[in-house]
Amino acid sequence: MANTNSAKKMVRKIARRTAVNKARRSRVRTFVKKVEMAITSGDQAAAKTALVEAESELMRAVGKGVYHKNTGSRKVSRLSARVKSMSA
């Protein structure tokens, strides 16, 4: 348990930040699922538009510090490779 006032405040700040980051991570997962559903359904146009939205959301989360930049880049790269392979 936090003893000092500053430690108590840090506990409150961490709880707020955790909630915000959890929401951001959930939002990213939702956008990624939309891309994956479009890929499995075979709808290439929907997959491309969903990929653009998912990439934007992923990079926003990277900028906010929710994901490491390499993690974001890896996820975008793998998703775009899967969308690209639909046309081949």
Curated annotation (Swiss-Prot):
Recorded superkingdom: Bacteria
Alphabetized Gene3D superfamilies for the sequence: Ribosomal protein S20
Entry keyword set: Ribonucleoprotein, Ribosomal protein, RNA-binding, rRNA-binding
Listed GO CC annotations: cytosol; small ribosomal subunit
GO molecular function, one term: small ribosomal subunit rRNA binding
GO process terms (BP): translation
Family matches, as HAMAP family: Ribosomal_bS20 (MF_00500)
Role summary: Binds directly to 16S ribosomal RNA.
Protein family per UniProt: Belongs to the bacterial ribosomal protein bS20 family.
Name recorded for this polypeptide: Small ribosomal subunit protein bS20
Gene that produces this protein: rpsT
